[in-house]
Amino acid sequence: MRRRTMVVSVLLAVSAAGLSYAGCVNKQEQKGVDIGASQSVKDLMVARGLTDADVEAALKTYVPPGKHDEYMIFASGGQSGNLHVMGVPSMRQLKTIAVFSPESWQGYGVGGDSDKILAEGSQDGHKLTWADVHHPNLSETNGDYDGEFIFANDKANARVAVVDLKDFATKQIVANPLVASDHGGAFVTPNTDYVIETSQYPAPLGRTYAPLSEFKEKYRGVAVFWKFDRKRGRIDKAKSWAMELPPYTQDLADAGKLDSDGWT
């Protein structure tokens, strides 16, 4: 069965909404005439001071009960530590996926297997119950989104999570033992063989301390290639590896596609 299209970027939805709104504003603002509305709808328009453009904009986002949105947005929850799923065009919030932070209302992090998942993401022996989620990314097949998994990174604590989209549930959190923070998102290679996590700020490797006077000698960046086992739906830490980089500040890091396949 063909999966419904999934969209990761909030900006895409916002841009589309902006274009629709701009088109509506340019139309002549008449009340209850051009859209062929029933008398009851016309009465509502008059009572509420709505224009045809207002009603048209509302209809563009309306999805009746029992019908599905055409697209989904997977938005980072920032310092909530979780992911938010919204439908497009309705913009309804369909789901909050608990990832790095406990969510008692959905039973995440308050007992059972979810406690073990959160414990997996401990850093330096400390159990973490907060995060700063940035740039979630969908799994890919031949460089195209396949909607099977989504990966999220914790910018504040250098961790990556695996979410299975069969049930929209977090299955694994891995902690990066090399770096203090990341900002490379959790981008994947074209067939999701690896999830790429890069450090944001240069720091001594191994999450240790060194004075700035030793910056050139001890401060470094890192790109980690987490090996993903698609059959198990888990990152295989034993088959993962890292590349040491110079001590510069890094931002997003994705894998190449088509002519740039094999580069990152």
Predicted regions, residues:
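Bacterial N-terminal signal peptides that target proteins for export
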Residues: 1-10
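Bacterial N-terminal signal peptides
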Residues: 9-18
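Bacterial signal peptide processing site
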Residues: 21, 25-28
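A short beta-strand motif characteristic of beta-propeller blades
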Residues: 49-53, 92-96, 125-130, 169-176, ...
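Repeated scaffold domains used in trafficking and secretory/extracellular systems
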Residues: 56-62, 103-111, 128-142, 178-190, ...
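Short, conserved, GDST-rich strand-edge loop motifs in beta-rich repeat architectures
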Residues: 60-70, 135-138, 147, 197-220
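Short coil/turn segments that connect the beta-strands within blades of beta-propeller domains
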Residues: 69-71, 147-148, 191-193, 261-263
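Beta-propeller domains
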Residues: 76-121, 152-177, 228-236
